Every structure is written in C-alpha cells, then in structure tokens.
Amino acid sequence: MSHPSWLPPKSTNEPVGHVTARMETTHAFGTPSISVSTQQTPKKFAPVVAPKPKYNPYKQPGGDGDFLPPPPPPVDDLGNITSQGAFPPPPPLDDVAFNVQVNPGGKTLEERRSSLDAEIDSLTSILADLESSSPYKPRIQQGSGTSSSAATTPSVSTPVTGHKRMIIPNQPPLTATKKSTAKGPGQPAPIPVTPIGTLKPQPVPASYTTASTPSRPTFNVQVRTAQPSPHYQPPGPQPTHYGSLGPGQPYAAPPARPPGAQQYGSPQPRGPDYGYAPPPARPSEPSYGYAPQQGRYQDPYYGGYGGRNGSEAPYMPQSTWKVEPAYPSSNTVGQAPPGMYQHPGPKKTYITDPVLAPQPLQQKSGYPSSGPTSSTPAFRPEDELEHLTKKMLYDMENPPSDDYFGRCARCGENVVGEGTGCTAMDQVFHVECFTCMMCNNKLRGQPFYAVEKKAYCEPCYINTLEQCSVCAKPIMERILRATGKAYHPHCFTCVMCHRSLDGIPFTVDAGGNIHCIEDFHKKFAPRCSVCKEPIMPAPGQEETVRIVALDRDFHVQCYRCEDCGGLLSEGDNQGCYPLDGHILCKTCNSARIQALTAKASTDL
C-alpha cells in the first residue's frame, strides 16, 4: 500500500498538471506461411514409332517406285543376313494399302520380297533381344548400320542414328514381365507411309520402350528391405557385374556366393557411419518381379530380439533357408553360438549346510548361478529368503546348547558362551563386534548413540553433528535453520533487543544481521520532520503510510498547518500552501502574504 504524496501548488491559480499515459502496442508477429509441396506423378510413356523417310535407299537410281525403307538391322544381327534368297517368303500383303504412287514396272516381285524380308528380320532381332536382355541394359548405338542411308538422304538435318530405348528417370531397376507393344515375329507390322503433298518429315531416332511405365510416384530408395526368396533365380544369364550403380552402368544381380559366412554387400555406395543397416530395397509389386541379391540377409536391429554384438545372438527368420550370421562373433564362455536358440539355465539347486556340531557357521553361497560368472556375487531377495529359511530349518533340527544366546547382528555367527555377548538396540552382539562405527572402540558398558541401527561413541557422534553459526558449538538437540545456517534456538536472537526469534517473524538487513520487525523499522524507517520519530506501520498492519511534501516525510497526524494547526488533506481549501518553506493552509497563507505586503508598504 503506497502512501499519498500531497504537493502544494505554487500559486492558487496554477492548474494541476495531468500526466498522460501512453499505451504502446506491440505489433503482433505475422502468421507463418505454410508451403505444401506435393510430388508430381511421372508421365506415362508409350511406345513411339518414328516416321520413316520418304526416300527409299533400296530403290534403283532409274526406278520410279516409292517404297519406305525398312529399319536398319542391329549390328549384332548383320552377320546373319547372308543373301536375299536365304529368308522364307513372307505372307501375301494384299491388305496393306499404300497412299503413294507406285510404278509396278520399277521392281520385280523378288526385290519387293527381299525388302520385306529384311524388315521382318529386323523386327525379329529386336524381339529376340528384348526377351534375352534386361530392360534397363543400355544398347550399343547402331550408327554404322544406317550411315549409308543417312548419307544419301536429301534435305535432312538429323541422321537416323539407330534404335534407341526410352530412358525413364528416377525408376528402380525392374526385371519382370515385359509389356511390349511390338507384334509377334510371324506377323509383319504395317508400315506408316507419308502422303504426297505434305511437308517432308524430319527423321528422328527410332525409339522404343521395353515396358510401359505405370503412373505411380517415383520409388523412394529409403524403404524397408523385403525378405528375399532363397529359391528364386533371376531370368536370363547371370551378369558378373554388381555393386554400386552409376548413371550409365547396367543393373545386374550379384552372383551366387559360396555357402560360407559372408557379409552382406550393399548395392548402393555407403559412407562411413556408426550403425550398420541393411541396404534399401524396393517393395514387391503385382506387375514386377524383383530379382533379389543372392547374399546373406539380416534384419535391422531391434532391442527385444538381441543385438549385433558378440554377447547376443542376432535375430534370424524362422524358415527352411539356413541363414548364416552376417558378422562373425566370438563366443564367450558358457554361451551358445549366435543364431541358435539358447535354452534357459537349469533349475537352481540348493546345497544344504552340513550337519555339524555347534560350530560357527560361515555365510556362504552354495547356489550355482545360471548367468555369467562374476567376481562379486550378490544375493537377490529370494535367494536371501531361502538362505534364511534353510538356516532356520537347520537350527530347528540342531538345537543349540544351553550357552547359546543368539546370532550376532554384526558378523552373523552364533553367540555361544557366557560373557561373550551383549544386548543393545534389541539385538545380540559379540563383545568384539559391538564397537563404534567410526573409531572401532568397544562400547560394552559405555554410553553410545544409536543412529539408524548403528552405534557411535559420544565423541564420534558429536563430531558428526552440525555446529551453531553463532556459538560454533555442536547442536545436540533441536536445530533451528534460517538463512541457510543452523542455530541453537536460544542463539537465534535479534541484534538490537537480543530477544529470541524462535517462532517470531524477523528480517535481515543488507549485512545479514537478524532483526525483529520493530527494531528493523526503528533502525531503518524514515523519520517524521515534525516529531522526529520513525514512521512505522500501524499496529496489525504490514505497510507504512506516510506523507511526502517539500521533500520531507510526515506522519498523517503530523501533516498540519504551522500557524493554525489544522489538519491538511487533499480536499478543497484544505491543501498545503507553502510559503518560505513553511507548511500553511490557504487561509494562513493569505494572511501571511497580506502582512508581508503591508509591512513592505509601510517601509516605503
């Protein structure tokens, strides 16, 4: 609760100043924009058949017929073409319609059949190559087979460079059922013919695709590895190249490895890392058959199935295919090799204590452990319970002699014989065992202090106690903590009146000295300029109310007019009108001004 501050105006006609409040508004932060990016679906590519040039390279220079040339045969199949008459005659082409002017007298029937046979042979070689090779194996550029045709073609800008396959980016290698748009080898394909009167088309490389691309999002390389089938063999010949794939390298599955323990080879380059994970693979799809690598398979590490270190067996899939460990591990003593199911240890057998005379029994562990051996065996709660049960049964079957007093709580041995034991803290001890926990002095017949079932002599117990921050003596009884220190209750007093502050509110000055509330206000409270007494809170209050005027402090009851003694306040005509440093009311202020004016006029 703050005190009122009453400051008198300098003149009666002076208006009271008004403090305007300024409200600052902090501009709110703009909402963040969210950009959502979606993955575009790849376009679907279809087989494209390039238009054939109008010029016929097989036409004689003096002939008049316009026949489209057949596609050039591949380089690999040029050796198979021996002569024109070596091919079987094609079926009649009565249903083929041509939109060009043909001169039947230009070529013989045998020449026409030879031209069609060459085209059929080219298509046959293409289909045979499609069935025997990987769809993503790059084909050798067949530029030599069309050099003669490109050299004699008039008005062309790009020569026919051969058959090129369509490259589909960002797709995984697929070795599956081929979906080809070409017809069977026994059916000739219709030949597209350019009509007369149109512009001459520019010849482009004849492109074809081995499989239709499904309209699916591109495969993500970072996918979970599918479990390969051990009996699956990839179609076609097995290439010898495997490893990391480059932009221009063919994809091939690795060859079969010997049945020895081998490491799993990643098909993609992998940088140095700290945790090995199986290489990413592609999920199996209905229309594609994935050719897995013939390597050893290992699932990713899961905490509940064992680790990859030498002390744990890796998790193996339960199948007829024998999977060998990916990493050779050294077996420890008493542990099954990795990959084999380790049966739990045999049931614990307990060796009973020997039946002897009342001889001191040694606490020993006669239980074989099923886990790994350790240098410091520790009792589990159930083992300790069984051990005590056996001891009790042994004591019941072998009652002690008349001099038996019990079992020592310190060493666990029997206390036998008169004068060899003592009783303390409701327990039995040997005389030699009942000693101080710090100085090991015998405590029989001596005063001791029991702390948590442990015995201490008086000097050692006192040394463990806290000391009072005032008298520096150990606190034997109740401890009073304040300001982070420990005190005796009678040492925690006010520095002014020396009264004990046990249970009484107190405060601390800047020097850390403890004061009661009254003495603190008497020492540090502001003084009234009229009565010179400290301005303290009213009885029962915690806050101090004072009046500040002319840079001076006043009690509420001491803020009065110096001439008439009237109580000043903030009411109308009751305020303070100071004059020459005096606290005056309005009436007394006017009277003093008139007296001073009259005196000045008489002096003149």
Curated annotation (Swiss-Prot):
Residues 31-96, 129-381 are annotated as: Disordered. It is found in: Nucleus; Cytoplasm; Cell junction. It comes from the Eukaryota. The keyword DNA-binding does not apply. One of its GO terms (cellular component) is cytoplasm. Residues 42-53, 143-161, 365-377 have a biased composition (Low complexity). The keyword DNA repair does not apply. One of its GO terms (biological process) is cell-cell adhesion. GO terms for molecular function: metal ion binding. Keywords: Activator, Cell adhesion, Cell junction, Cytoplasm, LIM domain, Metal-binding, Nucleus, Repeat, Zinc. Residues 32-41, 207-226 have a biased composition (Polar residues). PROSITE patterns: LIM_DOMAIN_1, LIM_DOMAIN_2. SUPFAM superfamilies: Glucocorticoid receptor-like (DNA-binding domain). Residues 406-465, 466-526, 527-595 form the LIM zinc-binding domain. Belongs to the zyxin/ajuba family. May play a structural role at sites of cell adhesion in maintaining cell shape and motility. May be involved in signal transduction from cell adhesion sites to the nucleus. This is Lipoma-preferred partner homolog. It comes from Gallus gallus. The gene is LPP.
